[in-house]
């Protein structure tokens, strides 16, 4: 591809054709995956379609494509051929669960941008059942450093017993080790942390270390989630009040 000004000149000189027809407007939109574009007598190669995957990151795997120390990374779980893939956002090494992987840089950037407030749901496995007060504080926002607090979140009890509990926490922000810092601030005995949902995409029964392609409907759902500036995310729209901690009737979310 040439520089912008040279491309504009080629268009104005009638050198560019789309499906055999001369194009003279520089702003003309084309779909290179469907339409045939030629410059002079040379046809432009079709662009490789983007790929979108859901990956169940195991504990101990780093969310990076290379580690100088030789520790396991997500790269070893990705296809060796096809478009260049990269993870969307990060999960700590000691956190498991859903990680989106794609070759679509623009969509990935939007999904990570705080402007769009994409909700993410985590399952917190606790070694002791939490008090109602602790759950209420978790939902209202937690101060984990002077002047630094989490925003209101959605809290649900997935399972609860004498020896522990599983709590579903949905947040629409992504500060460094935020969920773990929230638990530490409330003295919640966190045994394990797993992300089970990102926006409309659910982890479901995807096995640890497994990778599955997203459906067209799921990709559309992600694009819809980042179309235009969102005034608020799911977690902010449904803040939990002291009496508003919800109990889930079923088990972990299932992929639909």
Tell me the role of every PLM-derived stretch.
Residues 1-256:
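Basic, flexible Lys/Arg- and Gly-enriched helix-loop patches that mediate nucleic-acid binding at interfaces
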């Amino acid at each position: 591809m040439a520089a912008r000004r040279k491309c504009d000149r080629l268009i104005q000189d009638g050198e560019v054709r789309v499906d055999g027809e001369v194009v003279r407007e520089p702003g003309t939109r084309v779909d290179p995956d469907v339409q045939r574009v030629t410059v002079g007598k040379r046809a432009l190669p079709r662009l490789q379609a983007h790929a979108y995957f859901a990956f169940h990151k195991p504990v101990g795997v780093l969310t990076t494509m290379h580690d100088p120390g030789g520790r396991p990374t997500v790269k070893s779980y990705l296809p060796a051929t096809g478009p260049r893939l990269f993870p969307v956002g990060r999960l700590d090494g000691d956190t498991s669960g859903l990680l989106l992987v794609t070759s679509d840089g623009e969509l990935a950037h939007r999904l990570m941008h705080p402007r769009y407030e994409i909700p993410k749901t985590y399952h917190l496995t606790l070694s002791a059942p939490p008090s109602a007060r602790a759950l209420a504080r978790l939902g209202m926002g937690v101060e984990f450093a002077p002047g630094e607090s989490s925003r209101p979140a959605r809290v649900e009890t997935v399972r609860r017993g004498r020896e522990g509990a599983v709590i579903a926490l949905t947040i629409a922000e992504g500060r460094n080790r935020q969920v773990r810092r929230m638990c530490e601030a409330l003295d919640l005995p966190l045994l394990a942390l797993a992300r089970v949902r990102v926006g409309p995409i659910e982890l479901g029964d995807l096995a640890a270390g497994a990778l599955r392609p997203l459906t067209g409907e799921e990709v559309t759902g992600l694009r819809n989630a980042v179309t235009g500036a969102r005034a608020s995310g799911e977690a902010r729209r449904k803040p939990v009040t002291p009496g508003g901690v919800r109990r889930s009737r079923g088990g972990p979310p299932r992929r639909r």
